[in-house]
Amino acid sequence: MESVSCSAAPVRSGDMESQRDMSLVPERLQRREQERQLEVERRKQKRQNQEVEKENSHFFAATFARERAAVEELLERAESVERLEEAASRLQGLQKLINDSVFFLAAYDLRQGQEALARLQAALAERRRELQPKKRFAFKTRGKDAASCTKVDAAPGIPPAVESIQDSPLPKKAEGDLGSSWLCGFSNLESQVLEKRASELHQRDVLLTELSNCTVRLYGNPNTLRLTKAHSCKLLCGPVSTSVFLEDCSDCVLAVACQQLRIHSTKDTRIFLQVTSRAIVEDCSGIQFAPYTWSYPEIDKDFESSGLDRSKNNWNDVDDFNWLARDMASPNWCILPEEERNIQWD
């Protein structure tokens, strides 16, 4: 009686590969279908985002035009301080509208809005000057009282400057400015402690230029801030309603809060930043970023006045115009290590 063999015939390697290929077909098809669905979803989301941005842009244009017309009418017919304060309040609303719209507005529309706002702010300042009572002419003798006017008055809770200061002459116009004269600031100073208070800074354009080994404290809410040709300086500034410009600086430490930060031709500088849009660097090296940590009495009030959203901070969202590679980090800037962020500001 012959025995029946139960052993299976040997399987050739070619047959195994064929079976493996067959088993992978459904998986490949499934993956391809998933990728197709993801692409469809991405396109759908992109269309929705474009529609939302378009609607937001239309809303911005209509709201801005309406509020601008209201402010212009208030300024044209303003015959009292109350009317001017209403115009100032509406301008703060316009500033907040611009700040909230910076992510979806085209660069041209954003620039047009900022320039229109700057013109309205200048017109408001002019109307305030016109409505101020005329001072009667009288001869005055210069004495101790006049000399003492150059000293910095210390605000409650804020340490005074080490030495009294006097505003140094400033250029009437800075190259590449935003179309308005620089109204206050410091220039051509070395190894000094310099301060300005909220009453001096409110919605004004500040220029700091050619400073060396200086500490500058700006307690308040400027409109714009420009720091140029500074070396080994420490700059502490309250919330800036629009932009901060930094150019030709080295070995500095800054604490600034703003809508946008632009840095040009600067090296070896640490920046403690609060920014609602983003920072832009160009022709720079050795720039380090960390979150904004400076504080002082009344800073909450200044943030409210500036129109900046304090809960929004893109301090580490930096564009380097000299580094276009998306898959590699720029060598020109970096995040300041946490162990190096403990700075005694005052």
From Swiss-Prot:
In-chain residues carrying the UniProt-annotated modification N-acetylmethionine: 1
Domain spans labelled C-CAP/cofactor C-like:
171-323
A Gene Ontology biological process noted in the UniProt record is: post-chaperonin tubulin folding pathway
According to the UniProt entry, which residues carry Phosphoserine? 80, 168
**Which Pfam family, any one of them, does this sequence belong to?**
TBCC
UniProt-recorded Gene Ontology molecular function terms: GTPase activity; tubulin binding
Q: Which InterPro entries match?
A: C-CAP_CF_C-like, CAP/MinC_C, CARP_motif, TBCC, TBCC_N, TBCC_N_sf, Tubulin-bd_cofactor_C_dom
* Ranges of Basic and acidic residues composition bias in the record: 28-54
A single cellular component GO annotation? photoreceptor connecting cilium
- Record keywords: Acetylation, Chaperone, Cytoplasm, Phosphoprotein
Localization, per the record, is: Cytoplasm
Record region (Disordered): 1-54
Q: Which family does it belong to?
A: Belongs to the TBCC family.
Record's subunit section: Supercomplex made of cofactors A to E. Cofactors A and D function by capturing and stabilizing tubulin in a quasi-native conformation. Cofactor E binds to the cofactor D-tubulin complex; interaction with cofactor C then causes the release of tubulin polypeptides that are committed to the native state.
Q: Provide the function of this protein.
A: Tubulin-folding protein; involved in the final step of the tubulin folding pathway.
Q: What is this protein called?
A: Tubulin-specific chaperone C
Q: Where does this protein come from, organism-wise?
A: Pongo abelii (Sumatran orangutan)
Lineage of the native species?
A: Eukaryota, Metazoa, Chordata, Craniata, Vertebrata
Q: Which gene encodes it?
A: TBCC
